[in-house]
Curated annotation (Swiss-Prot):
Molecular function terms, GO-annotated: cyanate hydratase activity; DNA binding
Keywords, sorted A to Z: Lyase
Keyword Lyase: yes
Pfam families named among the record's database cross-references: Cyanate_lyase, CYNS_N
Keyword Lyase annotated: yes
Gene that encodes it: cynS
Protein name, entry field: Cyanate hydratase
Enzyme Commission number(s): 4.2.1.104
Entry's family note: Belongs to the cyanase family.
Organism the protein comes from: Pseudomonas fluorescens (strain ATCC BAA-477 / NRRL B-23932 / Pf-5)
NCBIfam families tied to this protein: cynS, PRK02866.1
Catalysed reactions listed for this entry: cyanate + hydrogencarbonate + 3 H(+) = NH4(+) + 2 CO2
Length: 156
């Protein structure tokens, strides 16, 4: 039976265990994703406590990490989502995303509403991809694709 979490602590504690086992076994997020049939971003988010994994994927990942059936069952439970504590993020990488939304959030809202109408972009019916590409001017660039279904506001 599908279970649901009503506190973040159990999944966050499991995420700590997963990160420790991942490091001890020298595995990458891609190594853990391989064979699940799911995307790298989804599995990584699930292992960090933000999504439930299907049973077969949870069992496969736990086997790779040397974790027990209790861990697999917890990975299959619906988490209480949201990994950033209240306030402004302090991690530099996470803060840059916060900063991007501070700068471009109103622009994104204006363009979404102009092109789609009154509504939102779903974070549930959603795909995330990140790619590293070479910058012609030197160095690397991160290409991040946020692909969410548009959901119109419905008057009632």
């Amino acid at each position: 039976m599908l279970q649901s979490q009503f506190a973040q602590a159990p999944r966050l504690a499991l995420a700590d265990t997963i990160i420790d086992a991942k490091a001890r076994k020298n595995l990458s997020w891609q190594d853990l994703t391989d064979g699940t049939g799911l995307s790298l971003a989804f599995v990584t988010a699930a292992l960090l406590g933000q999504h439930a994994l299907p049973a077969t994927a949870a069992d496969l990942v736990c086997d790779k990490l040397g974790l027990d059936q209790d861990a697999s069952r917890l990975l299959q439970s619906i988490p209480l989502r949201g990994s950033i504590a209240g306030g402004i993020p302090t991690d530099p990488t996470v803060y840059r995303f916060y900063e991007m939304l501070q700068v471009y959030g109103s622009t994104l809202k204006a363009l979404v509403h102009e092109q789609f109408g009154d509504g939102i972009i779903s974070a549930i019916n959603f795909k995330l991809d990140i790619k590293k590409v070479e910058d012609p001017e030197g160095g690397s660039r991160a290409v991040i694709t946020l692909d969410g279904k548009y959901l119109p506001t419905k008057p009632f």
